[in-house]
Amino acid sequence: MNSFVIRNGFGLVRTFNTRLFTTSTQNLEGELKTILGQAKVSKLQEKLKLDPRSKITFNDFKGIAKEVGIEEKEINSVSNALAQSGSIIYLPNSLNENLKTSVFTKPAHIYQSLEHILDIENKGVGLNKLIESKKSEINSLRQKIQPLEEKKQVIDRKAHRRATAIIWTGLGYCFAQAAILARLTWWDLSWDIIEPVSYFLTFGSVLIGYTYFTMTKTEFTYEALNHRLFSKRQDKLFKRNNFPKEDYENLVQAIDKKEKELKELELATKYDHTH
């Protein structure tokens, strides 16, 4: 029997079809599941937006998806759906192993970088031509910086030798001080006389270290002292040899920038070959 009857207090009779009732219940359950699934995907998108990283591994993506309640068997379909909608960049079929196992959670940043590098407003320039042009620019900059690099290496060696010599002189002073105190204690004088002298020498060493820390705002360590002595001597040699420090630093920054752009162009070429 596929129906039942309900009689109300006024004697009116109403017949309900159980088949229709069951079907509507099933539809409702399906709609609820769809809504819950969409809510989980929405939570996943929010988590990815809040994540400061612009690139994560697919395993990290799976971990975040599981945190919001998405089941293991649904993760692949969810990732593909998000990739198709443009919410993420995921290339599981890429020939590049790094791209294949990575998820770019901030696709807008990638698109902006590509637009900036490729200069999309100037149409008609191929990626390979851009790469060759970028390599030519880098080679030109390296030729400009080479004589400065050679000159700087000579200056750096001199500055390093001076810093090392001063540090070894300090060590020699410590040994000489210990030898003189030993001589005065056991041969010329006695410990009763040398004790206050050694106390003030120790206190003076601590005072020198504290003064160094106060003046330079750096710890009184071997690394800090060596770096400071090296930098001081290097600056003096730069001035003495008329070394264009500013030009050199600008060239270094320009080369670094061009090399980063070249890497991004080469990555874009690999991406282009997979599509």
From Swiss-Prot:
Superkingdom: Eukaryota
Variant or mutagenesis effect after changing Q38A: Does not affect homooligomerization
Extent of motif Selectivity filter: 191-199
A Pfam family recorded for this sequence: MCU
Membrane topology (Mitochondrial matrix): 29-165, 214-275
Organelle transit peptide: 1-28
GO cellular component: mitochondrion; uniplex complex
Activity modulation comment: Inhibited by ruthenium red or its derivative Ru360.
Family the entry assigns: Belongs to the MCU (TC 1.A.77) family.
Assembly information from the UniProt record: Homooligomer.
Record protein name field: Calcium uniporter protein, mitochondrial
Organism: Dictyostelium discoideum
